[in-house]
Amino acid sequence: MAAITASMVAELRAKTDAPMMECKKALTEADGDLGKAEELLRVKLGNKASKAASRVTAEGIVVSYIDGTTGALVELNCETDFVSKNDDFLGFGAKVAELVAKQNPADVAVLSALEMDGSTVDAVRSALIGKIGENMTIRRFVRYTNGGKLVSYLHGTRIGVMVEFDGDEAAAKDVAMHVAAMKPVSLSADQVPAELIAKERSIAEQKAAESGKPAEIVAKMVEGSVQKYLKEVSLLNQSFVKNDKQTVEQMLKGVNTTVKGFTLYVVGEGIEKKQDDFAAEVAAQVAAAQKA
């Protein structure tokens, strides 16, 4: 059997970006043949990626990219908070955000087929899954290219905001931070989704009905609750986080600035995380051991 040297392992790692121990195992299995070892790793890492693909990805990062009046905000998911801090994963996210801004893909499927590093986005993603051992997905993205000015704000890597505006950049950055903190669902009250209003109205009706007041009073109570809700969740009507004596709209008017739109991404929002039942897991392991 051929001797496996450190330089051989380093060369294979440079070619495949696989972990050192995986490179050494592949070289041993290939009896020192670098070409065969590389092929073995490609197959092995591909299988590893396939196995990981079914696992829930509720952690991750939000990445932004701005070039003039074109920008992109992207959410990428992984399985653990640890991997969300991995330099390779962060680097992949930065490249994806730049591609979205520059190539304008219609959706994640189109984005996945775009060229990246001499391959495709999806191939690079799969290779990264194989290297790190966790499932990773590109969940969603938004692209701005309407000619307005853009600013972004990232709270760590878990919350990302992009704001399109005309006027004062410092004020727009304050708005981006406000959005991250207060999480409005729309720019103005008339843009709040109908399903959210209907849900809030239903809750208000149930509460008002319990008051025992006359129907006309109940109706006014319900309408008052709905209007209060609309002010609380629409950006322009919210109290400005840095000065609650004025609304966001009033602050913007004071500096002659207009917000044309915004996007807020929170990592894992709406994704159902798997809850580990350790007692059940131990019981299953004991049962399996008894059968063996």
From Swiss-Prot:
Q: Which SUPFAM superfamilies match?
A: Elongation factor Ts (EF-Ts), dimerisation domain, UBA-like
Keywords linked to the UniProt accession: Cytoplasm, Elongation factor, Protein biosynthesis
Compartment annotation: Cytoplasm
Which domain of life does this protein belong to? Bacteria
What Pfam families does UniProt report for this protein, alphabetically? EF_TS (PF00889)
Q: Write out the GO MF terms.
A: translation elongation factor activity
Q: Which NCBIfam families does UniProt cross-reference here?
A: tsf
Per the similarity annotation, which family is this?
Answer: Belongs to the EF-Ts family.
Q: What is this protein called?
A: Elongation factor Ts
Gene behind this protein: tsf
